[in-house]
From Swiss-Prot:
Chain's role: Molecular chaperone which mediates the proper assembly and functional expression of the nicotinic acetylcholine receptors (nAChRs) throughout the brain. Essential for the proper folding, assembly, function and surface trafficking of alpha-7 (CHRNA7), alpha-4-beta-2, alpha-3-beta-2 and alpha-3-beta-4 receptors.
Entry protein name: Novel acetylcholine receptor chaperone
Any one Gene Ontology BP term: positive regulation of protein localization to cell surface
InterPro entries (UniProt xref): TMEM35A/B (IPR040399)
Alphabetized UniProt keyword annotations: Chaperone, Cytoplasmic vesicle, Endoplasmic reticulum, Membrane, Peroxisome, Transmembrane, Transmembrane helix
Cytoplasmic domain ranges by topology: 1-5, 83-88, 132-160
Keyword Zinc-finger: no
Organism for this UniProt entry: Danio rerio (Zebrafish)
Residue spans, topological domain Lumenal: 27-61, 110-113
Topology class, membrane: Multi-pass membrane protein
Gene that produces this protein: tmem35a
Subcellular location field: Peroxisome membrane; Cytoplasmic vesicle; Endoplasmic reticulum membrane
Length: 160
């Protein structure tokens, strides 16, 4: 039977992956929801206006939206389907994207209800990453503990 930690990581990875594939697709195409796509276009225009440095670098609102949408779709697919270390990398990239999105929302002065999802999913990504890292560190700690116990037993003096 799988450990609770493994079940948690798999469930979080799958759910987060599907969410980011969905949200990234909404940013890239109006096929899923024309209203949501239009709202994304409007929001990213306001983000680009609030950051004139992006315009100086040649990053338009369309390019910014497509970059973030593509990152979300790509990393979402990795979180959903790819096993191993790439999930942690995708998780970290998505965490950075969520931080950028939170920054954009704060920059334009959006109310909390507009960016609460980014906050929640940022927390979930952080939890998933911490749980995954904790699971990897545990066998090493147990081995070190066993070595310390063995060393202590060898150093004990038998009293007769």
């Amino acid at each position: 039977m799988a450990s609770p930690r493994t079940v948690t990581i798999v469930a979080l990875s799958f759910a987060l992956g599907l969410f980011f594939v969905f949200m990234g697709t909404i940013k890239l195409t109006p096929r899923l929801s024309k209203d949501a796509y239009s709202e994304m276009k409007r929001a990213y225009k306001s983000y680009a206006k609030a950051l004139p440095a992006l315009k100086k670098m040649g990053v338009s609102s369309v390019l910014l939206r497509k970059i973030i949408g593509t990152l979300e779709v790509g990393c979402g697919i990795v979180l959903t389907l790819v096993p191993g270390r790439p999930k942690d990398v995708a998780n970290f990239i998505l965490l950075l994207v969520m931080l950028a999105v939170l920054f954009f929302h704060q920059l334009v002065g959006d109310p909390l209800k507009r960016y609460a999802h980014a906050l929640v999913f940022g927390i979930l990504l952080t939890c998933r990453l911490l749980i995954a890292r904790q699971a990897e560190d545990r066998p090493e700690r147990e081995e070190r503990r066993e070595e310390q116990i063995n060393a202590q037993e060898k150093n004990k003096v038998k009293v007769s």
